[in-house]
Amino acid sequence: MEFKVNSECSEKQSSDCIVIGIFESGEFSPSAEKVNKISHGYLKGLPQNADLQGKAEQALLLHHVPHVAAERVLLIGCGKEEELDERRYKKLIKKMVNTLKETGAKNVFCYLPELKVKGKDIDWKIRSAIEVIQDALYCFDHYKSTKTLHALNQITFIVTATQTKAAQTAIQEGIALAVGINEAKNLANTPPNICNPAYLNASARKWAEKFKNVRVSVVNEDEMKKLGMNAYLAVGQGSKNESLMSIIEYKSGKIPAGTKPIVLVGKGMTFDSGGISIKPSQNMDEMKYDMCGAATVFGVMNVVAELNLPLYVIGVLAGAENMPGGNAYRPGDILTTLSGQTVEVLNTDAEGRLVLCDALTYVERFDPELVIDIATLTGACVVALGHHMSGLMSNHAPLAEDLLHASEQSGDLAWRLPLGEEYQEQLDSNFADMANIGGRTAGAITAGCFLSRFTHQYHWAHLDIAGTAWRTGKEKGATGRPVALLSQFLLNKALAQKQGA
């Protein structure tokens, strides 16, 4: 898919389709007024039937509108102008794409970024449009004998002359973001008989070959044993697939000497059966998505490298597979973590935090500016927040505020949960420093509390993406969240870096 910007009058340029908005009660957007004028009142002369009421997400496809060079004109209902917010704007873009897919149109001129969206500029509108368009066109058909093909291959956004420069930058950022999201989706959707910890590492290495300022290394099981990463090792010992922690290091040549890295740690359970505490069989196939934290990190690193952001970012893909077997770890086991703290295993299905606790201790060696871990960690977070927002916890209020701000900017929403000392008591164990679960109540919070015990050396945030990383049902598949949130967070960091230079 190719994206362009143009500030010229597209109504007189040849194309397969132009897309314009109309508001409820027959109010026209500026572009609709233009088309109506060029066509000598053709749009105003259409019957005000149910197809042309301008209600949100209505669509009316017109062919051969008089004096308009495009073969088709697609009218998108925008609802009431004063109610047009970011959520509705994205829905309008999605409606546009889904309608265009059925038309056979190849090259399209789109006027929808002219719409006034509360609190959003042209940069946001074009970036968001690209993200929605690529999501609507995305199809994971790698393992299907018949591939899904769409004719649509070029969209030109029509903007004013003064908006052109910002729009071109937005296209560059939007494409990079869409690529990062799609790479995260592709990795997450890959079946678990193919996507194991070694596959995560191979994918990172192959991708890194495109960039001179990216390098990839790996911590294998032998090195983990030498280091004392016994919690991480325990989780994967029931699987024939070796646990591997892949480390992606991106370092811009534009940063000052002594810059500390931002570290992203992604839970990469390439399949989570639950181990000895085995999961119910229903929907167990979706446990291939337990590596969406690692997929997110991979996607974000794509965005950072594609945009050549002036940052130092390290991404950790904490890969392992949790399987039952004669060598699997058991409820009742006590593990000595890399930090020296001991953990009593009460449930082997609370394995992600065991992998992460050692990974979080490991990254201390990088002397990070901050660390963010991303994990499909708890079903409790899904119960608390549903599938709309990721759970956010942090030991540093400014970091949490920056992430929440980025979530609002991107529309990839998060909600902060508490990390109070009163919750820590639920992790008490009679036999070890802590247990790996904290009982039925506040499960997402106690999981965050567990991780917090391994993050005293740096500013840290935790994103629980169990409810947002993939969809179930008819639209089953990875969402690519929260690549957009974290990419926006890093774009903000890069902007601050430039302004401070």
Curated annotation (Swiss-Prot):
Query: For binding Mn(2+) 2, which residues are annotated in this chain's numbering?
Result: K267, D272, D290, E351
Paste the cofactor note: Binds 2 manganese ions per subunit.
Chief location of this protein?
Answer: cytoplasm
Q: Which cofactor does it need?
A: Mn(2+)
GO biological process terms, semicolon-separated: proteolysis
Q: Enumerate the Gene3D superfamilies for this protein.
A: Leucine Aminopeptidase, subunit E, domain 1, Zn peptidases
Q: Which reaction equations make up its catalytic activity?
A: Release of an N-terminal amino acid, Xaa-|-Yaa-, in which Xaa is preferably Leu, but may be other amino acids including Pro although not Arg or Lys, and Yaa may be Pro. Amino acid amides and methyl esters are also readily hydrolyzed, but rates on arylamides are exceedingly low; Release of an N-terminal amino acid, preferentially leucine, but not glutamic or aspartic acids
Catalytic residues as annotated in Swiss-Prot or TrEMBL: K279, R353
Which keywords annotate this record? Aminopeptidase, Cytoplasm, Hydrolase, Manganese, Metal-binding, Protease
What EC number(s) does this enzyme carry?
3.4.11.1, 3.4.11.10
- Gene Ontology terms: cellular component: cytoplasm
Source species, domain of life: Bacteria
Alphabetically, the GO molecular function entries are: manganese ion binding; metalloaminopeptidase activity
Its family remark reads: Belongs to the peptidase M17 family.
Q: PANTHER family in the record, alphabetically?
A: CYTOSOL AMINOPEPTIDASE (PTHR11963:SF23), LEUCINE AMINOPEPTIDASE-RELATED (PTHR11963)
Query: What is this protein's record name?
Result: Probable cytosol aminopeptidase
